[in-house]
Amino acid sequence: DESQAEVIWKLPRIIGDSRIGAAFYRETGDIVLYAPSFKLIDQFGTSIQRAEDVRFVNYIRFDASRPTGKSQYAVQKYEGNKSGNRGLADIKLLRTGEMYLIRAEASLEVSNDAVALSAASKDLNDLRAARISNYISQVYTDKATLLQAIYNERFKELAYEGHRFFDLKRRNLPVAV
């Protein structure tokens, strides 16, 4: 929450405002109200790949010391700044990363030619390079594979921001848990 480099529009939260982070985690008793889905966790790949992806490191906390029957994963995306105001986090409404994904998807929807495929691939690879250490750009040769990669990236990039349901519905995909 400290960096505002990619924020286009946000709802700033100040001391005295409600804390969005409190909806996900409570300090008292370490109650995890919302644990990340295994489907989302699996999208980040192996434990080595997870460690290289800044989103996993900042969105999801793993604690192997939690008792049996308790989720070892917790959402930490909205824990807020490090100055003692836990859970007080600005709400990012539009970010550069989302714009890259929108443009990549739009390029493929407008045209199915090599230029659109190249432009969409570049947007996706640029976003991933900004998020993943040691990222190696991927080459996409067909629209369907690239669109699926964009949808998967939206799932990770926009986790806990309220986009997933609408992404599934606008694509007529099943809403499954």
Task: For every predicted segment, state its role.
Residues D1-Y25, T46-V177:
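Acidic/polar-rich alpha-helix caps and helix-coil junctions
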Residues I31-G45, R50:
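Short, cationic low-complexity segments
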